[in-house]
Amino acid sequence: MCNNSDRERSSQNSSNFKKNLPDDFHAVIFTGGLFAPPQNTKKYWAETGQPDFIAAADSGLEICDLYCEFYKNEYDFFPDIITGDFDSLNSSALIEKYKIKPDVFPCDKDFTDTELAVAFVYKEAQKHGVKNPHITLVGGDGGRTDHLLNIYDSFAAEKHVSVWLAKEQGLYLLKDGFNCDIFELGIEDIVSVARTSASRTKGALRSEGLVWEANCFRKDGMPSLSNRISQEFYNLSKPVKLCAKGADFLVIVPLSAVVIMSKFEC
């Protein structure tokens, strides 16, 4: 079983540690539902490095356990906190395995297990002097549509995740005033862009390297659905570029893509 001393070694040995994160505190939340298989997330952790904090929400502990085992020689995904109402965890033996007293909430509550984990991460980040942590959410895909919509809506909340690794796609929050470069796209890979629930019409995007560039994007609702890298950019191995101004957006790409965020003037 992995442990926190492994985490320290992983952090020290990761040459890419935090180099591509805009914030100084990286937390991972595992939550129940369909999730990105650990073997399909290797590129993501290679870019972001060893996380600072791990939270498991309800049956997300089962996913956390899978990641802990799969990456035991590379990264430490040992949970720092286990929280939720535990109405979907298949076996309480998993809690005993990690020897952490769970933070248990009643089933009838005002927040989802994922929201509780996000709130806890923000409190933990504040202890480290970080106001806005970088949070990666693993899981939460499929199943109940209301939970899916809640996760989508949470990107517009004051306390939000930064990246959502769903079963087959990664959703990246592209904040106002930020650029993103999307590397390692296949010629048939789908690139989509959505607005957060904060607005249907605000903001504008600039793009480079898409088949249908930003001048073709819809002015309201979802700007671009099922777009692709242009043949020229693919042949030259150039990254697709997107820049957000005036609003936040969600960039949706395959798990195999590598997304790098940076803050520059659009």
For each of these PLM feature ranges, what is it?
Residues 61-63, 88-91, 111, 144, ...:
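Short gly/pro/ser/thr-enriched loop/turn and capping motifs at secondary-structure boundaries
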